[in-house]
Amino acid sequence: MEELTRSLVNDVEVLNNHFVSTGHPLPSFDRHTPTVVLPNDASPDAHAARERILDNALRLFQLAAGPSAYLLNLQTGYQYASCVRWLCHFQIFHLVPLEGSIAYADLAVLAKAPEPQLISVVRMAMTNGLFLESPPQHLAHSATSALLRNDADFHDWAVTMSDLSFPTAFAMVEAHERWPNSVEGNQTAYNIAVGSELPFFSHLAEQSDRKRQFAGFMRSMARSQGTDVEKLAEGWDWAALGQACVVDVGGSTGHTSVALARKYPDLNFVVEDLPEVVAEGPGYLSYLDDAQDLKSRIGYRAHSFFDPQPVQDADVYMLRMILHNWSFDDCVRILSRLVQTLKPGARIIIVDIVLPDPGVVSASKERLLRVQDLIMQQVFNSMERYLENWMDIFRKVDERLEVKRIVEPPGSLMSLIELSMAA
């Protein structure tokens, strides 16, 4: 513990020195604190120090708690999850004013919720950084709760997580008892949790509110450190393409293409997804400040990636957080459709997790990777993949399909896998 503490003290000093030298505000629970603790353009040393702080603080907590307190502390996880669902359902994030505070009694009336239970829930949530009690018997926003109020996409993430992800995770035992070793997309923990026989995306398509919330969740993931598209923009030499066409395969409403288009004005994009998804793309673009420029360079096309690829002359086919949703055989089918259309010099860019072996990366990072792996199993009967899993897929698609390079940008949970066809 002493060694971890010394490292923690040293890294906190490194991070504080960075904040002082750059003028970036110090981390705080105060509502006016920036939601991003360390911007992507901060120095590599600062990012490394922050990563070590997260890891060492986590390990110190685990060591200080010890085995006998493991289950005691485990309770907090599912209760935090329950609180988020309660707070979303009763619209507490939006009923608490951004400035100042509101009395519990008044908030309970607005929320149509019982005051004693309201107090219990929010005081539990406070121990995890949501809300502040100031003054006594009054509720005010913290930096984190204000984010969930102000940012509709992050609120959609919270709703999707609490209403769908939580019950799905708890149905994993029943799914594996009922369908051991299944790779079918409609034999999952999700199917048990929601009582549907449809695969996830087919079931989602029947529910307009859930579909909208899921799109918001995907946009918020694209802006979250570790999974944000800025890492994609920085992790590959997009500028070297010059004037080029990029197909955003399964690109939803186009949030990834938007981020790349803003940084690389020579690139044009075709966002492909199912008809009901891309139909919402132009509306998403129209709300952006730079909509006019983006509309001239980002187009939408209804397309299933299991069908022959209609765009034959693209320079890059990009699949960001797509293949992890699908089984081995489906991944082979998806990539085979792209290989059939690759012109000489064209690339396939896969942006997905490449799982490390246990203990290779920090525990604070590894647990986020393992979470994603479990989610893929629970929702799709798929998986996050180790490098050897990826290589097996590529060899099955075409022996000529070459991995040119694999890059994991600093601070990212995901890697960029560049593929091309051998001459």
From Swiss-Prot:
Its EC number is 2.1.1.-. The active site is at H324. Keywords: Methyltransferase, S-adenosyl-L-methionine, Transferase. Pfam families: Methyltransf_2. S-adenosyl-L-methionine binds at D273. SUPFAM superfamilies: S-adenosyl-L-methionine-dependent methyltransferases, Winged helix' DNA-binding domain. PROSITE patterns: SAM_OMT_II. Induction: Expression is positively regulated by the cluster-specific transcription factor aoiH. Gene3D superfamilies: Vaccinia Virus protein VP39, Winged helix-like DNA-binding domain superfamily/Winged helix DNA-binding domain. The keyword Methyltransferase applies. InterPro entries: COMT-like, O_MeTrfase_dom, SAM-dependent_MTases_sf, WH-like_DNA-bd_sf, WH_DNA-bd_sf. GO terms for biological process: methylation; polyketide biosynthetic process. One of its GO terms (molecular function) is O-methyltransferase activity. Pathway: Secondary metabolite biosynthesis. It is an enzyme of class 2 (transferase). O-methyltransferase; part of the gene cluster that mediates the biosynthesis of a methylated derivative of known natural products orthosporin and diaporthin. Within the pathway, aoiF catalyzes the biotransformation of orthosporin to diaporthin but also of diaporthin to the final product, by performing a tandem methylation of the polyketide core. PANTHER family: DUAL O-METHYLTRANSFERASE_FAD-DEPENDENT MONOOXYGENASE ELCB (PTHR43712:SF19), PUTATIVE (AFU_ORTHOLOGUE AFUA_4G14580)-RELATED (PTHR43712). Belongs to the class I-like SAM-binding methyltransferase superfamily. Cation-independent O-methyltransferase family. This is O-methyltransferase aoiF. The gene is aoiF.
